[in-house]
């Protein structure tokens, strides 16, 4: 969150359902938590409508940021007449932060096995947030649905007269609400179109004109990928500068990990989907599976570091539960001999040869933040 805008990132797990669908509410809401990236920053006061969201004509397949199978509305409608509270079989979905100013989101996406769903639909998604810049990555996008295309939506906004392709060589895509997108990896489609949709309560036909852009993964994709950058309300000089010199570097993007270095903040952020043992990392020897790590230099020998496992670690998988979240221990190996600048109850360090074993006890899906120095 900065100034007068906010971004909301949404996933779901075995403990947190992806959407609340009822008999006469949110009938087409299946994709709300498939990695959505909602920007709200326009309107007086700032509102959803002011930021480009209106229901009339809205394509429920295209929530910004989500990776989805683009279905006809009769198939997207919940197969259950009453309540649908779909949860994932995966537990790695959530966010972390560093110094309360910058953050990241990561998820293992896996669709449920319901009628008109595609149960082998999987993907690994991440969003890295630095100041007014977001880096969005996707890997392993796969499913067997050969009837309908799989897409990752950049934006869908009520058309306000501003064209989606802007800049020299159409380098930037513009959502019409002062947010700009550049796709590094992916086949992009952009359109301004009159759309026909359905009302989420009554299923009545609705219509509206929207500006949209998305990345095509095709039908029944195998190991699809994407990479794009988002600038939120940038200045003209921001657009010019970042076109010439990107502010970030992707250090790894595969099924094991998504790793991004941001040049302006100096932050390196890791979404480790599987056990990660980087060969040439400056700091880490090993990060365990399903862990988010962020760090930045604070001094010549010191770093600010955060570690997070978003899993609530709740054993009881019922509709609701009184069971509290349980601690999870993460063991991270660092190069060299590190010490904490101040003791912490939930952090332990042990020197092993020329490495340091950092043991962090995570709880409630919250990041544990610390200062460390290298001797």
Regions found by a protein language model. Name each.
Residues 345:
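C-terminal His-loop and adjacent cap/lid subdomain of alpha/beta-hydrolase
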Residues 1-341, 350-354, 362-374:
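Extended polysaccharide-engagement surfaces of secreted carbohydrate-active enzymes
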């Amino acid at each position: 969150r900065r100034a007068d805008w906010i971004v909301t990132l949404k996933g779901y797990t075995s403990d947190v359902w992806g959407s609340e669908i009822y008999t006469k509410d949110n009938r087409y809401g299946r994709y709300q938590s498939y990695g959505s990236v909602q920007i709200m920053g326009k309107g007086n006061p700032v509102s959803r409508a002011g930021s480009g969201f209106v229901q009339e004509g809205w394509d429920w397949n295209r929530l910004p940021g989500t990776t989805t199978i683009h279905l006809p509305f009769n198939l997207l409608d919940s197969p259950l007449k009453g309540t649908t509270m779909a949860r994932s079989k995966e537990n790695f979905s959530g966010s972390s932060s560093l110094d309360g100013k910058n953050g990241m989101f990561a998820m293992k996406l896996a669709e449920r096995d319901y009628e008109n769903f595609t149960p082998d639909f999987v993907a690994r998604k991440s969003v890295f947030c630095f100041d007014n810049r977001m880096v969005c990555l996707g890997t392993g996008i796969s499913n067997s649905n050969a009837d309908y295309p799989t897409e990752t939506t950049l934006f869908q906004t009520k058309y306000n007269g501003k064209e989606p392709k802007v800049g020299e060589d159409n380098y930037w895509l513009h959502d019409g609400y002062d947010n700009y997108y550049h796709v590094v990896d992916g086949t992009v489609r952009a359109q301004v179109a009159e759309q026909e949709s359905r009302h989420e309560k009554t299923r009545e036909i609705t219509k509206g004109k929207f500006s949209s852009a998305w990345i095509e993964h095709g039908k029944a994709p195998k190991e699809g990928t994407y990479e794009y950058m988002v600038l939120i309300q940038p200045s003209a000089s921001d657009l010019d500068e970042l076109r010439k010199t990107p502010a970030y570097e992707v250090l790894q993007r595969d099924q094991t990990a998504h790793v991004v270095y941001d040049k302006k903040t100096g932050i390196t952020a890791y979404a480790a989907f599987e056990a990660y043992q980087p060969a040439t990392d400056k700091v880490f020897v090993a990060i365990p599976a399903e862990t988010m790590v962020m760090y930045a230099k604070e001094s010549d020998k010191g770093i600010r570091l955060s570690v997070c496992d978003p899993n609530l670690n709740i054993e009881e998988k019922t509709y609701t539960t009184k069971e509290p979240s349980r601690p999870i221990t993460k063991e991270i190996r660092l190069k060299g001999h590190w010490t904490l600048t101040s003791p912490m109850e939930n952090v332990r360090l042990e020197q092993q040869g020329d490495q340091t074993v950092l043991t962090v006890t995570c709880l409630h899906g919250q990041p544990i933040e610390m200062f460390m120095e290298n001797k």
